[in-house]
Amino acid sequence: MSKYSLLFNQGTKDGTNASSGSEANSANITSSSAPASSTNTSSPTSSESAVVSPPASTSPRRRLIHRRHGSAGAAEVAPLSLPKRPQQPNEEKHENFISDSVHHCSNRGASGSELKALTTSGSETVMSASPDIAFEAPSPPTASASPPLESTSAVESDGDVVIDDMMRYQEGDSGGSRSATSAAAAGRAVSTNDAAALINGDPGPLSSAVSSSSSGSPHTPPRLFTCDMCLQYVSTSYEALEQHALDQHGDALADYTRLRSVAEKLVPVWDEVLKRKASVVQQWGKRIFAVAVQRDAGAEKMAEAHRARAQLELVVQRWHPRAKVFIFGSSVAFGVWDGISDIDFTVVDVDELEAGTWPPSEKNAVRSITELLRRAGFSFINLEPISHARVPIIKHHASLPIRLTDEQRHRLYEEARQSAAAVDLVAAESLASSSPSSAQETTDEKGLTQLEAELIIARSVRYSLNLPAGPPDSAILEASIRLAVGSAAVQQVWWNRTRDMCCMTFDTTTNAVKASTCPLHFMSAGMRARVQPLHEECRPELYGMDFDLSFRAFGIRNSHLLRRYLLSHPCARPGALVLKDWSKTSGVNNSVNGYLTSYAINIMWIYYLVHRGVIRYVCPARDIPASLRCNVDADPQYAAMVDPTWTPEERAAMEAQAGELLLGFFYYYAFEFDWVNHVVSLNRPGITTKASLGWDVEDVAQTGSPAPHFGVAGSQHQYNLAGAEGQQGDLHSGTSLSAPQTRPLTGYDGMMASSASAAARRSRATTRYSFCIEDPYEENLNLGRHMGVTKTLRVQTELYRGLLSLLKDDPQHCCVFAGSTNSSGSTDSNGAMASGAAEPAMVAARTPSEPTELPVRVLYKLMAISTRELAIARRRYSATVTAGTEFPGALLSDLEAAFLAQAPTEWKLARQVWNKHQLLHRLGLKLHAREYVLPRREVGVRRLAAKAPPGVVPASAPEPTFTAEEVAAAAAESGQAPFSAEHAPTSSEEVTQMNRAFLGAFPARRLPEDLMLAMTKGYSCLTPSWVAWSKPWAALSAWWTDRLHSPSTTTQGEDPLASGTCEQGGVSPSLPTGAPHHISAVPEKSAGAMHQTRTQLRRHVVAEIASTPAARRVLRLLFR
């Protein structure tokens, strides 16, 4: 039984009695209606015999639909009170209705078809009287494949009951239908065949979608329409429903009537308008191609998307080893990626897909892959698993970077160069000649916002251990990573001094993600590692982009179908980009609130181009292969938006055609397309009707939900349900739809409203066919299934608005290009860029005012200044205060003054994005007592003096901060000539000599402060060796490794892996025991390739560490 039968037969407990009563009624009506049609007279006596009383065993309740006197022309009726038990007077009302109606028609000379219609409507009323709630629901105009229209005058009656919408679907070219442009003139048509079928004993009119009588005549049930803002309102004609939406929900459709009346004046003179607006059309064509050029970020950005897909596939294969990740969506359909919009990924196992067993349990897959991504370092906040949607997906929202213009970026370059020159002239010269942060950038450099150090950091992974790792654990950990990614892929390995954190740098970001997801092994029981990228902003490509991950293959084939269409004409992709921006800014593209998606907008655009003959039709089933094994590439190929070989004449012709097509799109869907009877479909060439798809009757109620009520004229009940179809505001355009004005519901009405609201929230099974767009591959799927009358009228309003705006507004105020203007910046620069001849380099061109990502070195600069100020404040405090008191911190006012004095641009930009507390948190600081600033965690400052060997400083300190007396005293003790204060070391040998000369008699308590000062100098110069960590104290601890051993325990023949020494960063055996040691500023490489298995590696470790008695005790504990 369909939903429509449940709707009208709710409460029926004995279906046999109901059907028998219906058949008896139909039989008696057959005998009584024939004389009435032949003699044009009727009497109550003759019609009384046609009524059969319902069975006395089970008497269901009845509801009669009454209308007020004099309410001719109204299309909707409302419920009255429910009688306790159907009695004989109610049956007499049905008898009188038939006789009085026929008598009224005979008095005014009605035709036989009208009498048959009345007799048929009377039979419908009697047959539907047996269920619990009986409705008089005549059919509205239904879809037909033929354009002719047959209409008759509406039946008027003085009785209590009037049915003003009685139309039946008629097979063939003579069936009743109406077009979108002649809806007001469409009358009511009556099908003689359907009436005869009902007279001959056809079953109840609402029992099924398609039924036949005993004689084989076709029959279609009446079409019902519901409002999408008040789900309890039901109408039998779309005109009445549209008028209801305009009357009751006019606040949400304030501009519909005004814009439609103005736009309709263009219909008779449309060809003349196009001729007069030829210059305007050319102007919009230039603007369209300017938007297309701005969205094309080049082949390099598409390569980033390819690397992100490969990285995600490595994570997914930890869940399903044979699964592959494909890119679909706009990046495939358009062939470009702008680097900002989100990317759609889908996971498919090709073998299982061809076997028919894919996808697996999508909810479990969402949970499993989400857990794997979080283990790989993805944030819990940015990763959003959506497992209870119609299509379960995983959404990733990347953290928004700071936006910076080209002018501000070059200003930062200049200030960074000047500040580096103020610190050290030699360093400034090397920075200007070799550093990518200088203003004199090389011509082959593509990324202006990335330093060499940032690229190194993006390939680095941090492993934080819960316990300190001994030599066996560290060796096993490094070996497990090398076995997963390959020994040649590992470039550097760093361990901190406490052996609880390891950082590894790889050759590519893809290998870094692979190392983040590989299984880790340890020797000690209970040891675990938390894996995450080294830096919060410099990470592999997958971490820094928005993406959606699904598990269905429909999107792959859909995207390649759109790609085939859009790449077939040069104007197709630019126009689709403009319409996508318009749909988002106008609110038409808002699937969260039940509107359309970008996919639906693209289908509308392609359907229009095919209908106009601009592009050829492509069969979705025949021309696009279904198999993904050899026909689809996981990485979409890049295709430039603008052909660089165009001549100025060819470009002008394309611009004129693009402007005309964009203007015609709005006119076509505003006036030419028949939304009442036709469907936007690419499944077949030509026109597709709603009747051919079975979409001419909509699902109006869910199973178990209350029966919808008809409205009483003058007091219509409005139930504002905040369910799936509720209006919750427009997220894209920034405006919200006002809720309909409703009165508070109490008693029975309030109970019905709350229960209906709960049912609407529980189920989204309501499918509407007011706005029909057929999906090319998913069967019986309407992409506009959530759009009712109110949302349809809103979309039509935006079509009218866009059409009028293109004809009368200037480029700065046109609503169609509102989204493109906000994203592309200056209109003049875009127009100038689009007007010239196309060049290959213009595809990736950017306007000066276009925002780009803020370089990470801006935070490094503020971090360096804050660290220096903290060190200076600590030194001042220790010089004035006695020992034993705790350092309170640096004054916040002093820190802000230092920011304004040394980095005003960075400070201003950072404060535009974060407040004071957020910025301090990003810098690794905390506010103490509302006026002092301290590090959140001082790693390596208090423990450094106790555990670090005395006299060891990092090699990157360009100029140790010692007084002249200290320098002279150290030089005199060592017997060497003192170095000049202006001379900075340029090699490791010079730093080693400086360490020997200066640090012989230097007190150990001054070591941490001087190390911090020396480290911040490296940060200010922005050298790659100093930006390996996001926090200065973490960077300090990175080079204090415990791999140093005394010369007595280290020999030249020992394996570096076993002893922990390194040729670059180890201790030179030639140095005396008390001489200061040198640690290289460049993180040391892990020596030795590890291709052995775990058993071989264990034997190797055993052989190396068994040389001392202490190591033997460790081995007995490990292998007991």
From Swiss-Prot:
Region (Disordered): 1-156, 196-221, 1047-1076
Biased composition (Basic and acidic residues): 90-103
Enzymatic reactions: RNA(n) + UTP = RNA(n)-3'-uridine ribonucleotide + diphosphate
Phenotypic consequence of residue 390 to F: Loss of catalytic activity
Cofactor (UniProt): Mg(2+); Mn(2+)
The keyword Transferase is annotated on this UniProt entry: yes
Domain PAP-associated: 659-697
Effect on the protein of changing residue 598 to A: Does not affect affinity for RNA and UTP
SUPFAM superfamilies (UniProt xref): Nucleotidyltransferase (SSF81301), PAP/OAS1 substrate-binding domain (SSF81631)
Main location: mitochondrion
A family per Pfam: PAP_assoc
A single GO molecular function term of this UniProt record: RNA binding
Any one Gene Ontology BP term: RNA 3'-end processing
GO terms for cellular component: mitochondrion
Residues covered by region (Important for catalytic activity and RNA binding): 750-1120
Residues covered by region (Involved in oligomerization): 800-900
Gene3D superfamilies found in the cross-reference section: 1.10.1410.10, Beta Polymerase, domain 2
UniProt-annotated binding residues for UTP: 330, 341-344, 555-559, 580, 584, 598-599
Protein family: Belongs to the DNA polymerase type-B-like family.
Protein name: Terminal uridylyltransferase 1
